[in-house]
């Protein structure tokens, strides 16, 4: 879709950031120079290329038209219409295509014009300026060299407060609809910026006294309670948990949605906030609570709510990681294998948009690493294509992990784990240089302790596979262990190979204890009796299922051919 005044060729030589002669006058004082540069940037923003002006005006008109139409629909007591859907589609095209192209051309590593500079172009429309600032600050975090300043971090927080206040504190449903992709990106970026600020405030070594005083006097900015409050408020306002409960039981979610939850804006923000809470609790190391917030989401079924691929991938990444840390390896393997198969089959779809591809590709690589860890600690059969990829990427490292190389475990965990954070404001008078690493080091220690407990299990498993009966003392001798130490390790093997595994139900926390180990044993006096529990793959069932599917497809095609 082209917008009015889009003419790249005519403006190709235009440089909105051409330096004027007086910019060479630097004082040598870093603070004065920084202030001068900021003042210069603000002056520069007043000169906006025509193509950008036209784009902003078109963007504003599209959003304004949608809001006007939404007001009309609300007054007529209607939830939505084809007109609304069409305008949302136009905004999606602007958001995903036009904005990205213009960013690449004009603002690849520099900020977009400030909101104050474009305000006259949009009639000082408060709602549009909030949405514009959301994109403006997100671009600074992602692309601008040096990242956001302390002031920009604060300003972005206040802008999110304004956005969520507009949505949550209105007398009735806010007259706004946005594409699902943008709504997901809002929640995703909100949590990312909180995470970024939590780490930023812990790194005080290179901060001036003025910056530290500023942080000390504003402890409520990007406070964990305010972030949790926003996410829970969006969940409650949308009544999304009740909607999901009814939806998964086969009912109509609209019947329990309420005044706000009937509208796409609230429904999707509520759903994305549940995934946001999953992510936030995982970053804080509370894995049980992380999975509990999804108790009404059935992960193993396709859902009308899972329309944004990044949301799907993020959900499975954090659920899989939480399972791994809760020692539910079989569930972690199932979750990772399912989403990796999904990415493998839909990869071409993501390559159309670079930023989506980069994000999904990174989490894809991280999940392969986590799957390698889980399969080493709990060997079981997975999809052949995923297994092949895993062998190509991590074959050597998996062999080293099987031999008990703790360094490889730590290396893969460090690469693939989330960026943990502390919800507590640091003591700015005495901050340890590595204070920002403490949440990660704490989680790494928990993981490393678990690895250490299982260090001998891979070797024991390989010996058990070789025999059906063997004196305990003899097998202990093979492993250079005393008989008592070996009996302890056998007990550890029994304990660690029994996992709580999800079998049915909606809640991902449900399950029953199972063992997927390929060997089992019992001890009778001084003899160990071993049984191979590996089940031969039944290819016949697979082919029968495929034949039935093919016959069903054939019948469907015949019916389609008979239609007039």
From Swiss-Prot:
Pfam families, alphabetized: Paf67
Organism listed in the record: Gallus gallus
Domain PCI: from-to ranges: 331-537
Taxonomic placement: Eukaryota, Metazoa, Chordata, Craniata, Vertebrata
Assembly: Component of the eukaryotic translation initiation factor 3 (eIF-3) complex, which is composed of 13 subunits: EIF3A, EIF3B, EIF3C, EIF3D, EIF3E, EIF3F, EIF3G, EIF3H, EIF3I, EIF3J, EIF3K, EIF3L and EIF3M.
Entry function: Component of the eukaryotic translation initiation factor 3 (eIF-3) complex, which is involved in protein synthesis of a specialized repertoire of mRNAs and, together with other initiation factors, stimulates binding of mRNA and methionyl-tRNAi to the 40S ribosome. The eIF-3 complex specifically targets and initiates translation of a subset of mRNAs involved in cell proliferation.
Keywords tagged on the record: Cytoplasm, Initiation factor, Protein biosynthesis
GO cellular component, one term: eukaryotic 43S preinitiation complex
Record family assignment: Belongs to the eIF-3 subunit L family.
Taxonomy, superkingdom: Eukaryota
Subcellular location: Cytoplasm
Name the record gives this protein: Eukaryotic translation initiation factor 3 subunit L
Molecular function terms, GO-annotated: translation initiation factor activity
Primary location: cytoplasm
Biological process annotations from GO: formation of cytoplasmic translation initiation complex; translational initiation
InterPro entries: eIF3l (IPR019382), PCI_dom (IPR000717), TPR-like_helical_dom_sf (IPR011990)
């Amino acid at each position: 879709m082209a917008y009015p005044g889009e003419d790249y060729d005519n403006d190709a030589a235009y440089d909105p950031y051409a330096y004027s002669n007086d910019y060479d006058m630097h004082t040598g004082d870093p603070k004065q120079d920084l202030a001068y540069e900021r003042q210069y940037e603000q002056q520069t923003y007043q000169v906006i290329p025509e193509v950008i002006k036209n784009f902003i005006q078109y963007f504003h008109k599209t959003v304004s038209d949608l809001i006007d139409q939404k007001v009309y629909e609300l007054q007529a007591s209607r939830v939505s219409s084809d007109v609304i859907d069409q305008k949302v589609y136009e905004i999606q095209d602007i958001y995903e295509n036009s904005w990205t192209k213009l960013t690449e051309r004009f603002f690849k590593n520099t900020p977009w014009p400030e909101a104050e500079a474009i305000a006259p172009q949009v009639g000082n429309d408060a709602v549009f300026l909030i949405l514009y600032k959301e994109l403006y600050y997100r671009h600074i975090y992602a692309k601008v060299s040096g990242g956001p300043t302390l002031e920009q971090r604060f300003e972005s927080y206040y802008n999110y407060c304004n956005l969520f206040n507009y949505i949550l504190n209105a007398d009735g449903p806010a007259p706004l609809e946005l594409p699902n992709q943008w709504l997901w990106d809002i929640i995703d970026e909100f949590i990312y910026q909180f995470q970024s600020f939590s780490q930023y405030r812990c790194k005080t070594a290179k901060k001036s006294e003025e910056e530290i005083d500023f942080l000390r006097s504003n402890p409520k900015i990007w406070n964990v309670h305010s972030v949790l409050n926003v996410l829970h408020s969006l969940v409650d306002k949308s009544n999304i948990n009740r909607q999901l409960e009814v939806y998964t039981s086969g009912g109509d979610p609209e019947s329990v949605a309420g005044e706000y939850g009937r509208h796409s804006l609230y429904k999707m923000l509520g759903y994305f906030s549940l995934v946001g809470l999953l992510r936030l609790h995982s970053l804080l190391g509370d894995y049980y609570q992380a999975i509990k917030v999804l108790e009404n989401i059935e992960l193993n079924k396709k859902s009308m709510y899972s329309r944004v691929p990044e949301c799907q991938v993020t959900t499975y990444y954090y659920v899989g990681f939480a399972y791994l840390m809760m020692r539910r390896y079989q569930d972690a393997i199932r979750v990772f294998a399912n989403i990796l198969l999904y990415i493998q089959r839909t990869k071409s779809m993501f390559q159309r948009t670079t930023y989506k591809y980069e994000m999904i590709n990174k989490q894809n690589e991280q999940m392969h690493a986590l799957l390698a860890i889980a399969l080493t600690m709990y060997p079981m059969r997975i999809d052949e294509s995923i297994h092949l990829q895993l062998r190509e990427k991590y074959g050597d490292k998996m062999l080293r992990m099987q031999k008990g190389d703790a360094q490889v475990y730590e290396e893969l965990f460090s690469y693939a784990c989330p960026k943990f954070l502390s919800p507590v404001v640091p003591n700015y008078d005495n901050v340890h240089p590595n204070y920002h690493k403490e949440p990660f080091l704490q989680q790494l220690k928990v993981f490393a302790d678990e690895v250490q407990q299982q260090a001998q299990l891979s070797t024991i498993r390989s010996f058990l596979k070789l025999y059906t009966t063997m004196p305990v003392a003899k097998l202990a001798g093979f492993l250079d262990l005393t008989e008592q130490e070996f009996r302890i390790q056998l007990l550890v093997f029994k304990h660690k190979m029994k996992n709580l595994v999800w079998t049915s139900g909606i809640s991902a926390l449900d399950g029953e204890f199972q063992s997927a180990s390929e060997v089992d044993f019992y001890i009778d006096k001084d003899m160990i009796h071993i049984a191979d529990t590996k089940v031969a793959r039944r290819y016949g069932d697979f082919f029968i299922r495929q034949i039935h599917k093919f016959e069903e497809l054939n019948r469907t095609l015949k019916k389609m051919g008979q239609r007039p």
